[in-house]
Regions:
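A structural-propensity feature for long, helix-poor, extended segments
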Residues: 121-150, 322-338
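Intrinsically disordered, low-complexity linker/loop segments enriched in Gly/Pro
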Residues: 139-215, 286
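Conserved phosphate/anionic-ligand binding catalytic regions in large, soluble enzymes, centered on
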Residues: 80-107, 199-207, 283-308
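Acidic/polar, glycine-rich intrinsically disordered N-terminal extensions of enzymes
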Residues: 15-93, 97, 101, 121, ...
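Short beta-strand elements
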Residues: 82-88, 179-184, 188-198, 251-261, ...
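Conserved alpha/beta core surface patches that mediate binding of polyanionic ligands
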Residues: 66-78, 109-121, 158-184
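Short glycine-rich or small-residue beta-strand-to-loop segments that form or flank ligand, phosphate
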Residues: 69, 91-98, 133-140, 191-201, ...
Length: 338
């Protein structure tokens, strides 16, 4: 049931041969589990029990979780831990962390406790802007695109007033809009580049909705503009960017070297010297930088997941930022002040 019958299926010998399942999304949760157990788990008598024991006893809560994604059969749990002792800008806070890797929460807590008596963590918000683009193709003259943008800009912005109203009340909304000529990188490629302030929200839905409206208005204005010698610009896609080099926070800690003490037989001075050199190596050597930054993201991802945010977006943006000058580098710097 639910399987295409009477057909010949070819497969590599290293894979299990089985017919493709059809209308899988239409099967009930129980039927999906039956299929999984029969096709992939050797009809194990304990497999169904293992899957169902991770269901939430509260059916309403389980239904809520099932609705987050598609074709769900069970829940995948992460340990949800707490890292206390964090003194951030003179405010003592406890950090939630959801991660399956051992020692990450312990290391964060230990580091926080060390810095607690040494001024804690200091932050500097360098920027909070996010961006998105309407990607366009136009194979006429660049001067024609410039003239069209001048013709359309006011109405492009006016068309966003209703979408931006709620975000503006919170001090956010679209900040700037510009036409960017990318034809040196790709023939005929232009973009409308928009920057946004989304306050405490990641703002993905808001940004995408705004960009889609820009694309709709752009198509309308293009049909009214008489200055194109070629076809009108074609909208390829309208979407936010997870690369946010203008949304950056610096975090720093500092103390005297003699406060480090001896660590596993290594003097504080030697430890600090080697620590700074290790960071310098990660700054110039991508092989080291990747693992160095992975360790940093252990903690960041854990907080992002624990707070219900999109860790894939953060990961993508962070690693792009680490490569912003053309080479992948360390996200951190260490300096010994004489």
């Amino acid at each position: 049931k639910g399987i295409i019958p009477n057909q010949l299926y070819l497969c590599r010998s290293t894979f299990i041969c089985m017919p493709p399942v059809i209308r899988f999304s239409k099967l009930s949760k129980s039927q999906k589990i039956d299929w999984l157990v029969e096709q992939h788990l050797n009809s194990s008598s304990t497999a169904r029990e293992t899957l169902t024991q991770y269901w939430n006893e509260d059916q309403k809560l389980q239904d809520l979780h099932d609705g987050f994604s598609e074709n769900t059969v069970t829940n995948f749990y992460f340990p949800f831990g707490l890292a206390p002792h964090f003194l951030i800008d003179d405010q003592l806070v406890t950090i939630p962390m959801a991660i399956e890797e051992s020692s990450v929460v312990a290391a964060a807590s230990k580091a926080a406790k060390f810095w607690l008596d040494r001024g804690g963590f200091k932050t500097q918000i360098k920027g909070t802007l996010k961006s998105g683009q309407v990607h366009l193709m136009y194979h006429g003259l660049g001067s024609e695109m410039d003239a069209f943008y001048a013709f359309a800009k006011a109405e492009l912005l006016e068309s966003l007033e209703q979408i931006n109203a709620s975000m503006k009340k919170r001090g956010g909304g679209i900040q700037e809009l510009s036409l960017v000529d990318k034809t040196k990188n790709l023939k005929g490629y232009y973009q409308l580049h928009a920057t946004f302030e989304t306050r405490d929200a990641m703002g993905a839905n808001f940004i995408n909705t705004t960009l889609e409206q820009l694309a709709t208005t752009l198509k309308l204005k293009a049909s009214q503009f008489q200055g194109f010698s070629s076809d009108v610009p074609e909208v390829i896609m309208s979407i936010l960017s997870n690369y946010v080099p203008e949304c950056v926070v610096n975090v720093s800690v500092s103390c005297k070297i003699d406060e480090i003490g001896t660590i596993n037989g290594v003097t504080g001075a030697d430890f600090v010297r080697k620590f700074a050199q290790a960071v310098d190596i990660a700054t110039v050597e991508p092989y080291r930088a990747v693992t160095h930054n992975k360790g940093i993201m252990n903690g960041i991802d854990a907080v992002v997941i624990a707070t219900g945010n999109d860790f894939r977006a953060v990961e993508a943006g962070v690693h792009a930022y680490a490569s912003r000058d053309g080479q992948y580098r360390s996200l951190t710097r260490a300096r010994i002040a004489v």
